[in-house]
Amino acid sequence: MPLLFVLLSYLLGTFPSAYLAGYLSTDRDIRLMGDHNMGAQNAYRCLGRGWGLAVFVFDLAKGSLAITLALAAGLSPGWVMFCGLAAVLGHNWPVWLGFRGGRGEATAIGVMLLIATQPMLIMGGLGLLVLLFTSSVIAASAVMFGLLWLAVILYGLPGGVVAYSIGLPVVVGLTHFIRSRKNRL
């Protein structure tokens, strides 16, 4: 039963919100526009503020929905976190689009909002401040995810959640690094 929810979470993650936004707004594949990334930041740059925000909300919701379904099914905390990872992996490597997806930032935020709500809200607020002052999504994400583990510890959450608050952002960061290198080559 838990593996079924992991698979469902992966499939939720594969919902291609940026891809659909690209076709709905310009009749073009977003992976052929801007930085070729299928995520909210590229949608914002190439399609405009409204489309970028819509993609961000949908991508965040994919992560939150995966966790909500796993919790509703009564899965153990380990399986719930695995479902969150599966949603991020689905976003990053969707089977329907040749495994060419986004970087997973918004989906990971959606996951962490339900795994560690208060720490994620605080770090999300801090990330938003960094974004407002620097206009850099990379800097905002680095601060938000880079300090999330510390906020999780300060809130006294279990060690598994601390490890997850480090591991999930590592997946996002590595995906960003790999995709950025490919775009430079």
Curated annotation (Swiss-Prot):
Example GO molecular function: acyl-phosphate glycerol-3-phosphate acyltransferase activity
SMART domains for the chain: G3P_acyltransf (SM01207)
Keywords recorded for this protein, A-Z: Cell membrane, Lipid biosynthesis, Lipid metabolism, Membrane, Phospholipid biosynthesis, Phospholipid metabolism, Transferase, Transmembrane, Transmembrane helix
Transmembrane segments: 1-21, 47-67, 69-89, 113-133, 137-157, 158-178
Pathway: Lipid metabolism; phospholipid metabolism
Region forming the signal peptide: none
Catalytic function, reaction form: an acyl phosphate + sn-glycerol 3-phosphate = a 1-acyl-sn-glycero-3-phosphate + phosphate
Documented EC number(s): 2.3.1.275
Keyword Transmembrane helix: yes
UniProt xrefs under HAMAP family: PlsY
Protein name as catalogued: Glycerol-3-phosphate acyltransferase 4
Organism: Dehalococcoides mccartyi (strain ATCC BAA-2266 / KCTC 15142 / 195) (Dehalococcoides ethenogenes (strain 195))
Lineage: Bacteria, Bacillati, Chloroflexota, Dehalococcoidia, Dehalococcoidales
